[in-house]
């Protein structure tokens, strides 16, 4: 996900996406431990997407708090 896509979504949608990304990340960790994970680069993509979403959500909270 790119930052423009993330910022265009509502906070509720971002929370849902965040939950799904975290579940996918946990599944990838299990697959890696079992030796079944073929796409290792997906780890960094998921982690970066999670970080972008959390950054956007925290930015929105700070803006609401200061407004």
From Swiss-Prot:
Record GO biological process: translation
Record-linked Gene3D superfamilies: 1.10.287.310
Originating species: Wolbachia sp. subsp. Drosophila simulans (strain wRi)
Annotated keywords: Ribonucleoprotein, Ribosomal protein
Pfam families according to UniProt: Ribosomal_L29
UniProt-listed HAMAP family: Ribosomal_uL29
UniProt gene name: rpmC
CDD domains with a match to the protein in the record: Ribosomal_L29_HIP
Domain of life: Bacteria
Family to which the UniProt record says this protein belongs: Belongs to the universal ribosomal protein uL29 family.
Protein name: Large ribosomal subunit protein uL29
């Amino acid at each position: 996900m790119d930052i423009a896509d993330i910022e265009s979504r509502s906070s509720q949608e971002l929370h849902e996406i965040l939950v799904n990304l975290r579940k996918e990340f946990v599944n990838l960790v299990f697959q890696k431990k079992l030796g079944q994970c073929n796409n290792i680069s997906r780890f960094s993509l998921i982690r970066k997407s999670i970080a972008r979403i959390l950054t956007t959500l925290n930015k929105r909270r700070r803006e609401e708090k200061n407004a």
